Structures are given as structure tokens and as C-alpha cells.
Amino acid sequence: MADTDRLSLIRMNAILSILEKNHVDAVIIAHDDEYLSEELSADKQRIKYLTDFSGSAGYCALISKNHEEKLSKDPIFFRNKNEEEIKLDKNAAIFVDGRYSVQVRKQVNLEIYDTFNLSAIRPEQWLCAKLPRGSKVGIDLNCFSYSHYLQLKESLEKADINIIDLEHNPVDEIWNDRPAPIHTKVEIFPDEYNGCPSPQKRHNLACTLREKNYDATVICDPESICWLLNIRGRDRHCLPVVNCRMVAYSNGTLEWYISDDHIDPNDQKQLETHIGHIDIFPEKRFDEVLERLSNSSSSVYADPETVNAHVLRLLETGGAKISLGLGLCQLPKACKNHVEIAGEYKAHIKDGIAMCRFFAWLDELTDLSQYENDEEVFSRRVNDTDEAVLAQRAESFRKVESDYIEPSFDTISAIGTNAAMVHYNYTEADYLNKLGDGPLYMIDSGAHYLDGTTDITRTVLAGPGITDEMRRMYTLVLK
């Protein structure tokens, strides 16, 4: 057994011991963190720590060992809505979407985990098929949206299975070498790029609350908060936000809950000039404002897709009048003003220039006429050019453009068969393909510039060996 597989087994058994100690029959572990973000810092990558699966979405479900004796010894099959019959072998499973069907089987220990596509079977369906009535399934409410929690609760209760709020995330309890949280400094996003100063956005939000007769709205989506305040940060890989939460009131006041480490005292005056007066509190006190809102019978608006179940359950415990719907920042954030539209235009021109330079370089490198049209000579000459070299070269052309900040996501740089993995990440691969390992090269990449964000995907001929079937498939995709 490989070292990584052995670690997966040790960690899974440690989780099962926690379940047994807490008299919980099963657990569902979500990929997301308390902000319900797919882009996780290293200290929030719980499924990766537990199973080695590094995708940006998914769930892991485990059934307690002391419960195994109650389970049927006969093979269990689940028939889904498409009339597909799925065999449920193991008592540990990972559920992913179609982007990761190939990747998950390469990364996890298949001796202990079954892997399933979420379109075929979901964790709650798997548990309902395997567990007897009266069982208890634990989840960390912080890592599930409120709407997902309600859907889980309804599905499990139909099978007479209870959903339990775990006091602590079981992965956190066994993660002894867990990385420290990342708290980067708040950065001001200048009005010349955002097109609408923060005080105006705040005024618009307060007007909306008054029009709808809400006392307050709870905002737990860092992207919405950073948009509202016209700030940026570096707490997330390739996502320029700071982790924080907020309560906005109909009278225009804001309570911003954020770690002290995020704000440089020397910059606080400049920050207040930029966003207007704001009451700042340590994020660890966020539950206090929820209890206050609950006990005061306030009318509170929240987005059940971007606010986690812990937050809304806490509001429910008192007398808060909760209304649910699309977050009040979502639509204004999506409707770009003329400054933002002009910025995106400029960003895409810069990015287009960078990618044209990259493809010109690649065309010259892979021109067979340089190698006497000899495929063996070609392979020897370009053998040191792998997927990492290509990705880094593409970024180097972007870096020379004005106002470049960073990649907008991990570059998917894939030669040959690696392109079959929808979210292939060369930085996590055991072996990198090189030019000559396949005729096709696919690069999906993008960048953050001060004036806009880009995302471009291209598949190009980068070596000998193209077949009629490849041409046909490429043409069908292009169409």
C-alpha cells in the first residue's frame, strides 16, 4: 500500500472513532468552508486532507464501524431516476460532479472508497439506501448552505434518519498539522476602476432594505462584501477577497466582522475615507450579532445559497423574522457599470495580446520543418518542454502587460491524454506530459488585471500524430 493510501486509511479510521465516541452512525463531510467557497485556503481543504481528492467540489460520506453489524450483508443496489442500478459496496464514498469523474479515481484510495457521480447518486441517497431507520447522520452546519441543509434534512427524514449538528468538524479534530489560517491585508480597490464608490453602493443597499421593509440583511459571501466596500485581498488562491462577514441595516449602518489581522492600523483612516464610517468587530463575535438580531425579533433578509446553515439556524432559535431570497448584492454586482465594462474590454485586449505572443512562440517551437520533418528529432529537441513549462511561459507573457495581478484560476495546461481530465492541474500530477507525448495541447487560463478578469480556453496542434478522429472531434467541439 502506498504511503498516501496508508495515510487515507489512518485518517478515515480516526474519523470513524470520533463518530463512535459521539454515537453518530454516519457523517457527510462537505468540500466547502464556512463561507461556502469552492476556492479554499490550505487550512480549509478538509476532503483533500482526508482522501487526497483535490477537486473544487464534492462530498465524502462515512458510516461508523460500530454500525456495520446492523447493515445488510447482502449486496445493496440503488436504482436512480434514470433507471440505472448502482452497486453500493463500501461504507465510505466520495461524490463528485462530472468534471472530476476521472481525477477522483486517480487520487483516492479505491480500496476503501467508492466513487460516485453526483448526477447518479447523492450522499443522502447513498445513506438512505445503506442505513436502517432511526440512524443519526452528523454534519458540520457551517459547511452547508441553508438551502442544501433543508434538502438534506427532508431527504433523510423521509427515511426516518435524523440529521445531527456536530459541535466540531471531525476532520478538524484529527488534523494535527493543519496549516495556519491566511489573513492578508485589506487592499483598497480604487474608484477609477470600480465605477461606483462604496458609500453610494451602501446607500443603495439601505434603500432596498427600507423598500422591502427589512431591518437588516446578513451577508456571508466575501465576494459580495468586497464588492460592496470596493476592497480586495489575498485570502483565497486566485480569488482576490478577504474572509469576512457583515450585517447591513436599513438605516445605512454596517457591522463588519473581520479578523484584526486583516486591517493595518496605519491604513484605517484611508480605509474609512474610501468606504465611509463602518463599525468593525472581530469575526469571532459574529454569533453575538446573530443572537441579538434573533432576540430582538428583527426582520432579517438572507440568501440561503450563500449563508450557511449554522448562521440561519442560530437566527431561527429566537424570534427573528427571516426572509430568504437572492442576496441583495448579487444583482447589482452582476450588472456592470460603464467603467467596469470599459475595464473588461481593456483587460481582454491585453490578455489577447499576451496569448497571441504565447501561441506564436509555441508555433515556432513546434514547427516540424525546424527538425527536418523528423518526429524523433522533434521529440528529442522539445523533450524538456512539459506542461509546467508551457503554463509558466503563458503567464510570463501576461506578466509584462500593464496592471497584471495574478492568474484568475489554476492554469489547466494539458498535453495529450491529460486533457481528458476536465480540471486537470499539472502541479498535482505524478507525471507531466511533454511536447511529443500527443499532438494536441489544451490550455485553459486567465488573469486578474486591475481593470478586469479574463478566462480563455484553446486547443492547438503542438506536435506530430494528429488523426482524422481527433480532427473530427475538434471540429464538433468548435461547432
Predicted regions and their residues:
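Active-site neighborhoods and metal-handling regions in enzymes and metal-associated proteins
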Residues: 1-479
